[in-house]
Amino acid sequence: SLRLRRRTIEDQILVEVNGLAIQATNADRLVALAADETALADRMAEAERRRFQLGASDFIVVNLREESAADARLRELDAEYRRSAARAELVAATADREQLGL
């Protein structure tokens, strides 16, 4: 019947919106973790540069730490992009006119 079909579609929409909300929440968590990783990698690179200046490290190790810090920053940017995309999908799926600027 028409009511059953409508209820099924409503349930499917609800499941999809809930899934998008979960993705957005997980994306927020990923950004926080990536930011922590970036901060730690930056600290490690700075510490290695100080060790190098004191003669306790070599250029290769400094370079590896700096490369790790750069990679962490890229992962953070990717996480921020994914968070923005997840939020945009959620806003579009819920037809949040205020968020869409309509």
Segments (PLM) and residue ranges:
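Amphipathic alpha-helical coiled-coil segments
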Residues: 1-75, 82-93
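Terminal intrinsically disordered/low-complexity segments used for targeting and assembly
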Residues: 91-102
